[in-house]
Amino acid sequence: MNQEDNTGGGGIFGLFKWTKDALFGTDISPSMKYKDQEERRDRSRYAQDDTNFSMKFGNDSNRRSTNLSRSNSWSGLDSTLHRKYELLPEYNENGFNSIVNGDHHSKERIRSLRSPAPIVPREPLRNEPTDTFGHRLHTKRRTINELSNSQIPFIPPQEDDPLLSKFFNKDGVNEVRRSPYKLSVKDIPGKFPSPLTKRDEIDNYYVRDEDACHKNREYKKAYFDLFAQMDLNSRDLEDLCEDVREQREQFHRNEQTYKQAYEEMRAELVNELKKSKTLFENYYSLGQKYKSLKKVLDQTISHEAELATSRERLYQEEDLKNFEIQTLKQRLSDLELKYTNLQIEKDMQRDNYESEIHDLLLQLSLRNNERKDTSAGSNIFSTGQYDRTPFHNGNNSYDSNSHSWDTDYLKNIDGFIER
């Protein structure tokens, strides 16, 4: 008994020590001791019953207290859960993800996510705090209005809650019920007997002291088992939070990579569109030039066709004129030849006619001379003198008058021949 009292495991000394600690706060309670362990330094703001010792409530119940947010199943959601349940991602007032921009609220949510899971809800319905060993001396009770504005609604534990079932083991409860001693208020850890206790209970206290020490050991063992399980759960939760954080960082890195690739692709597409626009404008201008050139070419072809037709017509007219010229030249040459022949024939006929005329005139003159000689012979002594040059007198037919007569005669002959 004395050994147990010296170790603080139970008995009157242990009960007195716990009572003294609860009333005056002179020593550290088991919950505060667990909170101050080095391996649980992340739980510096919370006690064993999930009570926040750093909470400072004012009169303003509507103010935003992001530092008091507790880690729960809905804090620190990743994009997979948002996509699965079609939830909107968290964005700040600038329109960007608050976690990427280092928002204080998101950092607090990540810090709360790395904290261990709560055993009981943060906001109990009762006004009395569950931490009996030191919380009552340093905090004040919250009103019903403050409790109603809590972020996480209170969910009462189910009948088959594993923690409560492990803590309040049914076999142990049945064993206590089957024991000759009834379970009173003073047997519950954290609760102490009323000063108005009955005398028989005080007399029987020493008898039940050994059983109480045994129960305290069992309760302490259950506490430590729960604490160890909480520590393992916290470590698993930290690992899970670390994985979630890494996945989120990887997701944001991928998102930045995709965003950069999208920006590059968008810039490239804009450049291609500008080049396509310039190419289309150049193509349109070339098309207009092609149409104008084609129109000019069509006009040129039509003019060339007209020119070819005119040239062909001129060639035909030239050939016709050349033929006419050749024909006229041939006719002219024929006429010239004919004229030459006629001229030669005319000259020959004139010579013939002149010779005949000359002969006829000669004969006529001879006849005249013969007549004159005949008459002269009869009158040889006549006074008239015989002219021996009959061709030179005025009556001779071979004078100028005779020449004119011959010329007219020849003209008449030429006209007769031409006819």
Curated annotation (Swiss-Prot):
Record localization: Cytoplasm, Cytoskeleton, Microtubule organizing center, Spindle pole body
GO CC annotations, alphabetized: cytoplasm; spindle pole body
Regions of compositional bias (Basic and acidic residues) in chain numbering: 34-48
Composition bias, Low complexity: 64-75
InterPro entries: Bbp1_C, Bbp1_N
Stretch list, region Disordered: 34-76
Modified residues (Phosphoserine): 29, 73, 115
Coiled-coil zones: 229-355
Keyword list, A-Z: Coiled coil, Cytoplasm, Cytoskeleton, Phosphoprotein
Subunit structure: Homodimer. Interacts with KAR1, MPS2 and SPC29.
Family: Belongs to the BBP1 family.
Primary role: Component of the spindle pole body (SPB) required for insertion of the nascent SPB into the nuclear envelope and for the proper execution of spindle pole body (SPB) duplication. Connects the central plaque of the SPB with the half-bridge. Required for proper localization of CDC5 at the SPB and for proper M-phase progression.
Protein name, per record: Spindle pole component BBP1
The encoding gene: BBP1
